A protein has these predicted regions:
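Radical SAM enzyme core and accessory elements
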Residues: 1-126, 136, 204, 420-491
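Short beta-strand motif preference
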Residues: 51-54, 171, 287
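N-terminal [4Fe-4S]-dependent radical SAM core
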Residues: 99-102, 122-169
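Conserved catalytic motifs of the protein kinase core domain
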Residues: 166, 256, 433
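Canonical Radical SAM [4Fe-4S] cluster-binding loop centered on the CxxxCxxC motif
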Residues: 166-201
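Conserved non-cysteine loop/helix-boundary elements of the Radical SAM core domain that shape
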Residues: 187-387
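Amphipathic, soluble alpha/beta structural segments
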Residues: 220-229, 410-414, 477-491
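A structural motif corresponding to the C-terminal lobe/cap of the Radical SAM core domain
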Residues: 310-323, 332-466
Length: 491
């Protein structure tokens, strides 16, 4: 779709609105107007920012307008956020009138809808008032308003237990047995990169030691620890033991309330590895089947069977892990609403106290996009999610965190569900941006959060294992950035 921006250059904001209504369209800024185009104009006065969109699509034209008060707002970040709100609301109203469709999340396009609601509640709104804003201003559906409000309240509860010196620690293991069709994460299959494993672990251990010194010297406190990937359990039991020994030796985890390892794929899980995790203090693991349908597992490149998943869950629960999560994905190739329903119903019998329901995100570089694999329609994905919500609630689960992603099927969401008291705190901390996340390992993204000053900064590690091994100076640079940020924050 040809986009003509006038009075602003907020391409990203408009592109996200475009994606919500027209996922097959791509933004174009050069050339003549075609059959589909939009003029998006910003008028900014002393008191108000007004967005006006005139949109033509499918032979229809509609005009949308939105006005947002900016008088008295001096903070540059906040003024820009309000300007973008006016633009996005104007585009939403025009697109809704042209298509006759209102997306489930209405005019909201950000990846953290619960954070928006949490901010409303922190600013003094009641849940009922926040609900009205979601309904009247953003046109969010009742089901999504409920998800956002419940997740926001979980975020408020998690935040109440935090101290200024609290951070979380993340360690990435960028190896998998094979690469799934939906995946674009920077992870290498073990069969292709086995020779890098030992040098990678040596480099990671050195970084753990340096990071441990920095955290101690800066007076920070580890609140939660999460090891993800990739698939951490591609490591052997002895490799895992050595790495976790280094973690426990170099970090003071006496205040750590959550020690989570993403066990991931059932074909990498065995008793010896799980015992290593328990011995080092892990109280939470994640077993991620994604689906229990054999044809879906085959379509996404998983070599394990549904029976392997059942055995892995039996093993994990019998060994006494306090918390076990299972990840499912709605919208995978070859899946159907009936197949997803069977998967969820079966997973609910396995004893997990956390179930995370993801919506397929169409990521650049994934085999789904590269090979054009057929996927379920947005209507079928909606049917899957519409089944999951009441089915999980009936079994005592409630939503506690959610986020959205770009190019997500049907413009839906990912939701973490749990039994009361089993919330995965790391998930809340990172998605609600409640405190800093120190990320170690290849592909790591360290997020530094100063909630008091509404300041967030990021530094990124080298993406690939070999690059990570060869660039220790970049790791040192990132640790020093983290140190400086928190020293400034403490002043």
């Amino acid at each position: 779709m040809k986009l003509n921006l006038r009075g602003h250059e907020d391409r990203y904001a408009i592109e996200q609105s475009l994606l919500a209504f027209f996922p097959e369209e791509r933004p174009v800024y050069e050339g003549e107007d075609g059959d589909s185009h939009a003029d998006v104009t910003l008028h900014e006065g002393n008191a108000y920012a007004t967005g006006v969109t005139t949109l033509t699509y499918g032979g229809k034209t509609a005009r949308g307008e939105a006005r947002v008060r900016i008088a008295g707002v001096s903070d540059a970040y906040e003024r820009e956020r309000l300007r973008q709100r006016a633009l996005k609301l104007s585009f939403f109203r025009a697109a809704r009138d042209v298509t006759g469709v209102t997306p489930s999340w209405g005019a909201l396009t950000g990846i953290r809808p619960a954070k928006l609601v949490r901010t409303m509640l922190e600013d003094g709104m009641t849940p009922a008032q926040a609900d009205r804003v979601l309904r009247d201003t953003y046109c969010v559906s009742p089901a999504r308003r409920r998800l956002a409000l419940e997740s926001a309240e979980a975020g408020l509860k998690a935040r109440s237990d935090l101290r200024p010196e609290d951070i979380s620690l993340y360690i990435g293991i960028p190896f998998c047995p094979t690469r799934c069709a939906y995946c674009s994460f920077v992870s290498a299959s073990v069969e292709k990169s086995f020779k890098l494993m030992e040098p990678y672990l040596a480099a990671l251990t050195a970084e753990v030691e340096a990071a441990g010194r920095m955290v101690k010297e800066t007076g920070l406190r580890i609140k939660s620890f999460y090891m993800g990937g990739g698939t951490p359990t591609t490591l052997s039991a002895s490799q895992m033991d050595a790495l976790l020994t280094a973690v426990n030796r170099n970090f003071d985890l006496s205040d750590c309330v959550e020690y989570c390892i993403e066990a991931g794929r059932p074909d990498t899980i065995d008793r010896e590895k799980l015992q290593v995790l328990l011995d080092h203090g892990a109280d939470r693991i994640s077993v991620n089947p994604q689906s229990l349908e054999p044809r879906v597992l085959s379509a996404i490149g998983r070599k394990h069977s549904p029976e392997d998943i059942e055995k892995a869950m039996e093993l994990a629960t019998s060994m006494g892990f306090p918390h076990v999560n299972m990840d499912l994905i709605a919208g995978l190739p070859a899946d159907t609403p009936e197949g997803f329903r069977r998967t969820l119903d079966t997973c609910l019998t396995f004893g997990a106290d956390n179930i995370t329901v993801h919506t397929l995100s169409l990521k650049k570089g994934s085999r789904i996009l590269l090979e054009g694999l057929p996927i379920p329609s947005a209507e079928d994905v909606a049917a899957m999610l519409d089944y999951a919500d009441p089915a999980l609630r009936e079994k005592g689960f409630a939503p506690y965190y959610l986020y959205r992603q770009k190019y997500m099927s049907g413009s839906f969401e990912n939701v973490g569900w749990c039994i009361s008291g089993a919330e995965g705190l790391y998930n809340i901390y990172i998605m609600e941006e409640l405190h800093s996340i120190l990320s170690l390992g290849a592909g790591g993204s360290t997020k530094m959060v100063d909630a008091k000053r509404n300041r967030i900064e990021r530094v990124f590690h080298p993406k690939f294992p070999l690059e990570y091994i060869q660039r220790p100076e970049k790791l040192t640079e990132n640790l020093e950035a983290f140190r400086r940020f928190h020293q400034e924050m403490a002043r």
